[in-house]
Amino acid sequence: CRDDQDGFYTIGAPGQTVTLPPGATDASLTPYHVDRGKLFVHERFGGHNIIDADIIAANIELTRFPVPEDSDYQETGDYPGLVRAADLIGQLADPHHMRKFPALFYEFVETGTSIRLGYKTPGDLRDAYPAFYWNVVNRYIQDGVRHLRVTQEGKQWIANLYSHVFAVEHHEPWNPGSQP
């Protein structure tokens, strides 16, 4: 973002910045990534003849996670809802998702999320994955899944998604260097 300076990063609102502690990674900016993304779009495309920065920002807004309770965030079949579904499916159906649990866990450590969720190890994060999928994610991606079923590549993404959930639910051996 334009207002970023060495050691100071805008958090999405004009004039508001955050400093990262020594050794911090980009994961420390996770709480601000939606607002930073919207700000970047407005900086880059605001006033463009063809690209409507407000529409893009509205799509980005629905990728906010955890999903706010407001009714504006509950729609799943409009473009912003489908963008959120694509974001979630893209992360959770990634062919390498299963071996990313350790890195994701340490991002959670850096942001304090691991403490809030009670995770002490990458295995704790992995063990909680099926409940997270079924109780949190599933309701937000079904319209996206319906669209993915139209193509063979989309069906592969769906298969990846469900195979990851199945593997953890059925306690498949976990080798962080390979897939289940």
Regions found by a protein language model. Give the residues of each.
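Short, solvent-exposed segments of well-ordered alpha helices
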Residues: 24-28, 73-76
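Histidine- and acidic-residue-rich, metal-dependent catalytic cores
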Residues: 27-68
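Divalent metal-dependent phosphate-bond-processing catalytic cores, especially two-metal-ion Mg2+/Mn2+ enzymes
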Residues: 3-10, 46-50, 62-180
